[in-house]
């Protein structure tokens, strides 16, 4: 006979929704109790059968061998009855197990669905939190990048200002140097001008000296010529030469006087 172990369950709900507590000695196992009752009924029936007139007459008239045969039949009948009872309650137990399995599956599915919803909700919240933290981190990185860019621009601006200042100083120094050079050049030019002026003055002096010498020479020549003319005129008057006969000579003489006078005048003018 297949029995339901008390270790595998604590309570059993019957068809009338009555709960049997297997740990309580006052209550008996539902299946065992029912099977026991059915066995008692079958035993009573068997007893009634064994007490039937035909069997009773056979028992009284037969020997011990017949009695053993009767008990063997009774045991076989009892065995078949137990098999029928076991089959019946095994089917009931299977039905109950299937029902319990369906209920457990429903509970499991509901719990699983609830856990899935909770997991989805938690996952969504975690995703949103991660997204928020990511955006926050990106904003921080962007701020750091902007600060770094601003700092770099300021450094470049300061460097550019320093370069401009340095270039300005260099230009000023160059201008000062150029001014100094220009002053030196001007001084040199002035010195050169002075030298040139001196040279010019010296040249002028030389020219003037040359002209003076030339004039003096020409003056001396003129004086000599005048002296010669005076002498010639004196000689003419002294000799009382006939002018009419010596007209040609006299004209030549006058031409020489005019030429000499013109040359002397031009020389004096220069």
Swiss-Prot record:
Give me the stretches of Polar residues compositional bias: 49-67
Sequence segments annotated as region (Disordered)? 35-67, 168-204
Lineage: superkingdom: Eukaryota
The protein, known as: Uncharacterized protein DDB_G0293860
Composition skew (Low complexity), residue ranges = 39-48, 168-191
């Amino acid at each position: 006979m297949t029995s339901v172990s008390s270790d595998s369950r604590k309570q059993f709900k019957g068809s009338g929704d009555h709960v049997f507590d297997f740990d309580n000695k006052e209550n008996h196992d539902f299946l065992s109790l029912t099977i026991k009752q059915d066995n008692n009924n079958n035993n009573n029936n068997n007893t009634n059968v064994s007490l039937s007139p035909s069997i009773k007459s056979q028992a009284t008239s037969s020997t011990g061998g017949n009695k053993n045969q009767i008990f063997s039949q009774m045991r076989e009948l009892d065995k078949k009855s137990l098999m029928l009872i076991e089959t019946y309650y095994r089917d009931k137990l299977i039905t109950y197990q299937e029902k319990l399995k369906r209920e457990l599956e429903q509970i499991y599915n509901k719990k699983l669905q609830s856990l899935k919803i909770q997991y989805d909700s938690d996952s969504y919240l975690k995703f949103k939190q991660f997204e928020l933290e990511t955006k926050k981190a990106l904003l921080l990185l962007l701020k750091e990048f902007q600060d770094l860019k601003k700092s770099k621009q300021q450094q470049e601006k300061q460097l550019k200002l320093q370069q401009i200042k340095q270039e300005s100083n260099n230009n000023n120094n160059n201008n000062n140097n150029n001014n100094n050079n220009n002053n030196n050049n001007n001084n040199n030019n002035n010195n050169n001008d002075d030298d040139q002026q001196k040279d010019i003055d010296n040249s002028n002096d030389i020219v003037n000296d040359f002209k003076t010498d030339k004039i003096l020479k020409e003056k001396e020549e003129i004086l000599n010529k005048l002296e010669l003319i005076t002498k010639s005129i004196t000689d003419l008057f002294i000799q009382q030469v006939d002018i009419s006969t010596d007209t040609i000579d006299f004209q030549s003489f006058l031409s020489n006087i005019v030429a000499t006078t013109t040359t002397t005048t031009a020389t004096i003018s220069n």
